[in-house]
Every structure is written in structure tokens, then in C-alpha cells.
Amino acid sequence: MKMEADVVIVGTGVGGLFSALSLPRDQKIIMITKSDLESSDSFLAQGGICMLHDKDDYDSYFEDTMKAGHYENRKESVDLMIRSSREIIHDLIGYGVDFQKQEADESGNEAADNGGETAAIQDIYAFTREGAHSRPRILFHADITGKEITSKLLAQVKQLSNVTLLEYTTMSDIIVENDECRGIIAQDKDGNEFEIHAENTIWASGGIGGRYKHSTNFPHLTGDALTISEKHGIRLEHLDYVQIHPTTLYSKKPGRRFLISESVRGEGAVLLNSKKERFVNELLPRDVVTKAIREEMEKEGTDHVWLSMEKLGKETIMGHFPNIYQHCLEEGYDVTKECIPVVPAQHYFMGGVWVDSDSKTSMEHL
């Protein structure tokens, strides 16, 4: 079988969906995903999404980002991310994403919202804080922000007549003609191979968590684009830059680790050792907190540390972190009354396929 498209997008998470929505409507687009449409890590994200408050926030936002990246970040990319963040958030709201709004003020009046015509986003929505940020600049939807964003984008894409969505379809290779990418070779769930020819190919295929025993990722995310890149000499970068999230719920059960969002620490949750003593500033960058946890575990001879959310209060926990509360309850922990055991696990892949500031790889049309 052979399919034709203007653009083929590998991956149906936030990156792939936003790309599809941003392309011209006269472009024929085919999107594929290895599993079902909702089994992408984008659906699992809990904490939120960062946004530049105003021009006065730029310098601290830039410095926070560079510091967290040990000043190895590509400055051009950091600048682009920060300066485009307000426009991206505006687009997401336009697609129906419902971020948490500010509570009513003392007079009982809620922040005005008429589509952003007269009120700025920062005057309407509530912001929380996460590690490495010097101020709250994260927009959120309870503790299921990823699900809120991705489900709304997916609903929008499903309405597009120019987009075809293929589930349970795996990219096994790319089609290369004259050193240019001209589409992909794919396999359906029965192992039948077919070609998707396209003028341009977009990889939005996720991370590498499936290669790890302990990860917060779905197991089918195995870094397929890396293997294909190595085969065709496509430039890769920083393959050793793998982020370990400090706090996942400790369990002896096999399978994906359940993430305990960094936002709980942003709201005041604290990390404790076996003696119930604090041992680290919980809002330091993730790699620093992870290192402190591992050192504490080694020093004490334990396989986890403890996280206390009790000081947040039941109202905040139930309102901001209902999913975490419910999952922990199912595992036998009431986070409103007791500490929970947490352990670091593989979470995010910061290396991968090299791209320029326009997200073009070293191969044309990819």
C-alpha cells in the first residue's frame, strides 16, 4: 500500500497536534501514532506550562532557564521559547484550553475575561511555581494540565477534513531520495508495511522512556527516530542528556512510574528522610534535587525518601491535585494525612535529533 500527503507527522502528542493545527488547511496531512491517540506522554503531564508575564519578567525567566540548563542551553532557542510563550498560550486558550483562573478578589469580583481584549492573561489566570523558577509563571489545570491541553488540541484536529489520523502505526524508516526525506515507511498493528510519501515530514515522536526499567513514560516510546537518524546520518545532539524526575511514587510493582508533580513542591510540599527531616531545597533544579535524594537514600540505606503534602491543606490538595490524591489513595496513602514514599525515575529526554531555530533537521524536508 502507498499513501500520499503533503505532510506526514509522526506522533499525536502536543507537538504533532499543534503542528497540524498550524499548517495551511489546503495541505493534506497524515498523522500516525504507535498506540491509541490518548497514549502519548503529553496526556500524562501534570504541572503546567510556563509563560512570560511581561517584558519585566524576561531577564529573570531567561536567567532561570539558563541556570537550570547549566548554561549549556542554546541561547537563541531559549529566547525564542520565552518570547513566543504568550502567543502560544493565547493560541491554546483559543483552542479551548481551560487554565485555572484567579479566585475572586476581596470585593468578590472575579478577574474579567472577555477573550483577552481588555484584560491581560496574567490578570485573568492563576500561576503556580515549579523548580528552578524564581517566581510563579506556570499556568495549570488542576494536576492534569497535559490531558487538558492535549485533549483539546486533539478535538480540534479531529474536526479538520485535511487530516487523517492513523492509530497503532509505527514508523520503521524514512524514504530518502537524493539525500532528502520524502516520507516514511510505516507498519500497521498486523506488521504490514506501507509507504507514506510526503513533501515534508515532521517528527514529533516522543522520548525514550520505553528503554528504561523505571520511567514515567509510556513503554512504547522507544526513541525510534534516533535509530533511523543513525542509519541515515542525520545529525544528533546530546544523547546523554536524560532528565530524571526527583519524585515518582515508590512502588515495587512493574510498569510505568506515577509522577508526583513538581507543582506540589511549588505549593509547599517538602522532602523528608527516614527521620522525617528536610535535607534539600525542594525548588532547586530537578537534577540537583534528584542528586540530593539519591545521596540521602545511599546514606540511609533506603530505596526511597518521603514527601509531605500535609501543610498544603486538604482544600488545596483536593482542588489543585485531585488526580494525585486519588491515585495515592488507591495505593494506600492519604496525602492529606500522611507522607508518601517517592523515588527518582527517568522522565524527560533533552537530547535527540538536532534542529535549527526553525526546527529543521540536517536532512532536507525533515
Describe the function of each predicted region.
Residues 37, 228, 234-346:
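An anion/pyrophosphate-binding glycine-rich loop and adjacent beta-alpha core
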Residues 2-5, 190-200, 362-363:
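Core beta-strand elements of the Rossmann-like FAD/NAD(P) dinucleotide-binding domain
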Residues 7-31:
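N-terminal Rossmann-like FAD-binding beta1-loop-alpha1 element of flavoenzymes
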